[in-house]
Amino acid sequence: MRLDQLLKHFSYESVQGSHDLIITDICYHSGKVKRGSLFVCIKGQYTDGHDYIMDAVKTGAFAVVVDESCMVNVRWECFIYTEHGKVRVHELVRNYGMAVIGVKDTRQALAQISAAFYDYPAKKLKIIGITGTKGKTTTAFLTAGILKEAGYKTGMVGTIWTYNGKDVKKAGHTTPESSDLQRELAQMVSNGCVCCV
């Protein structure tokens, strides 16, 4: 998907660099970046994605989404300040041909970008959410089983694993990050699921 198309689906404060880039993946972990990725810098409990911008650049990211509060303009030059020092935005744009997008909330931007990138898969599924203190997994399995018996191909997202209508995958986190969830929902749609529990 072209970056200029993605830009229509989320709020941003600034964009420096080309809008014509073809984005092939959305990543929030620098170790998963490949050529063509859009890397979203997420501040976590222990690490900050802004500290890994250059790692993402070196492994092929075409664009980076940063927290606007990390960007500082000094004498006609813009820097992204990280724990490891500063990164010159101009160098990312000029030397690497990247786009740098400043947003107020990178986590919210990741959710909006991912939904658009995967063509809003949640809108194509009947989503059944289960909350509570005890019995969620049992209730999810029973619900999915009832739907299956009724003829509805059903995917599942759980704390231990996900099922996309074809394959079972171990869950990376008890609560998936928005881009991971959108990717799984898109796979469910691709595999013919009509429901997700």
PLM feature spans:
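Phosphate-binding loop of NTP-binding sites
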Residues: 102, 108-197
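N-terminal leader/targeting and accessory segments in enzymes
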Residues: 1-112
